Amino acid sequence: MPAWLLAVAEPVTEATEGSAEKGILDAILESNLINIAIILSLLYILGRRVVGEALAKRREGILEELRQAEQRKQEAIERLAEEQQKLAQAQQEAERIRKQAEANAEARRQELLQQAEREIERLRANAERDLSAEQEQILQELRRQIVRQALSKVEQELPQHLNEQVHQRLIERGIQMIAR
């Protein structure tokens, strides 16, 4: 029997030997104390094992949860490292694409500038050609007008200066020029 049970039971037995006449109430009280002591002893003996097993199971459960949490933490760290690596690669790819886009835009800008320069040169050449053609046309028109005016003036003045001899000489010269 455990020592604490003996310590509780000893005063109870002394009380029962010295006072048998105290009555039924004392007997009930004494028996209740004994019953409580027995129940507490049984609870201690049986409960220690049950509580110990429950605590051991709980401890194992907590340890398992800690192991799983540590494993999840490690997996999360690995995934984080992978995702950070992917992010770094994506940022490098984005930077490469941005630089390529800038290079393409610059090349396109240069191409458009060259195209515009060629178009300007073509328009200048066309304008010069059109201007030359128009100048030539205007000169020809001026020559025609001058010839018409000269002919008109000659026709007006010729009859006044022309006599029969001069007329005959002009005809002969014209024939000689044709004959040559």
From Swiss-Prot:
The chain crosses the membrane at residues 33-51. Its main location: membrane. InterPro entries: ATP_synth_B-like_membr_sf, ATP_synth_b/b'su_bac/chlpt. One of its GO terms (cellular component) is proton-transporting ATP synthase complex. It holds the Pfam family ATP-synt_B. CDD domains: ATP-synt_Fo_b (cd06503). Keywords: ATP synthesis, CF(0), Hydrogen ion transport, Ion transport, Membrane, Thylakoid, Transmembrane, Transmembrane helix, Transport. It is found in: Cellular thylakoid membrane. GO terms for molecular function: proton-transporting ATP synthase activity, rotational mechanism. SUPFAM superfamilies: F1F0 ATP synthase subunit B, membrane domain. It is a single-pass membrane protein. The keyword Ion transport applies. HAMAP family: ATP_synth_b_bprime (MF_01398). F(1)F(0) ATP synthase produces ATP from ADP in the presence of a proton or sodium gradient. F-type ATPases consist of two structural domains, F(1) containing the extramembraneous catalytic core and F(0) containing the membrane proton channel, linked together by a central stalk and a peripheral stalk. During catalysis, ATP synthesis in the catalytic domain of F(1) is coupled via a rotary mechanism of the central stalk subunits to proton translocation. Component of the F(0) channel, it forms part of the peripheral stalk, linking F(1) to F(0). F-type ATPases have 2 components, F(1) - the catalytic core - and F(0) - the membrane proton channel. F(1) has five subunits: alpha(3), beta(3), gamma(1), delta(1), epsilon(1). F(0) has four main subunits: a(1), b(1), b'(1) and c(10-14). The alpha and beta chains form an alternating ring which encloses part of the gamma chain. F(1) is attached to F(0) by a central stalk formed by the gamma and epsilon chains, while a peripheral stalk is formed by the delta, b and b' chains. Belongs to the ATPase B chain family. This is ATP synthase subunit b. It comes from Synechococcus sp. (strain JA-3-3Ab).
